[in-house]
Amino acid sequence: SEVTTPAGSGPRHFIFNRKGDVVYCATEYANTVIAYKLDQESGTLTPFQTISMLPESFKEKSTAADIHITSNNKFLYASNRGHNSIVGYTINEKTGELKLIGYFPTGKNPRSFNIDPAGNYLIAAGEISNDLTSYRINRDTGELTVVQNIPTGNQPSWVLIGEY
C-alpha cells in the first residue's frame, strides 16, 4: 500500500519495532517521527502519532538523519543535524506511542549512529566534527551518558555494529 507523509516533510528512514506491529519514520525536513500502526494482514500503515525531534525553543535549521530502537524495544533514538543531538524517547509497550526522554549533545552533524545488540551503548558519528562519541544507555530511563569521544578521519558518515 502507499504511505503518504505531509508535503515537504522528507521521509528519510523507517524502522519497525521488535514486535513488527509499529513502524516509525524519521522525517528529514520536518524533524519529526511519525508512528504508524501496521496491519500485518493487509500491510497497510495508519499514522497515530507525530512527535517533534527538536526542542520548541530551537529555531535554527536542522535535519533528521538516523533512527534506531534498542533491542529490548523500550527506547527509540533519532539524530538531529543542525541541533547536533540525539533525541531519545520511551516506547509505550502497549500502544507504541513515544514519550520524550530528552536531547543529548553530539559532535557536529550526527549523520549516523547505531546501538550495540545488547542495547547498552550508542555510538554516534560527527560528520563535520570528525569524531565518534560513545554513550552508555541507562537501561531504566533511556538517558545517554557520554563514555568517550574519539577523533576519526575526515567525515565519518556511517556507524555499523556487527552482531557478537
Where is each model-derived feature located?
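Oxyanion-binding "anion nests"
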Residues: 26-37, 45-76
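Beta-rich, blade/repeat-based domains predominating
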Residues: 5-21, 53-73, 106-121, 152-164
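Beta-propeller fold detector
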Residues: 1-3, 44-53, 98-105, 144-152
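Conserved beta-strand positions in repeat-built beta-propeller and related beta-rich domains
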Residues: 17, 25-28, 78-81, 124-127
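Structural signal for beta-propeller blades
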Residues: 31-33, 84-86, 131-132
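C-terminal structural cap/anchor segments
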Residues: 65, 69-109
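Short loop/turn segments immediately following beta-strands, especially the blade-tip
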Residues: 36-44, 89-96, 135-142
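Blade-level signature of beta-propeller repeat domains, shared across WD40, Kelch, NHL, RCC1
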Residues: 127-136, 145-164
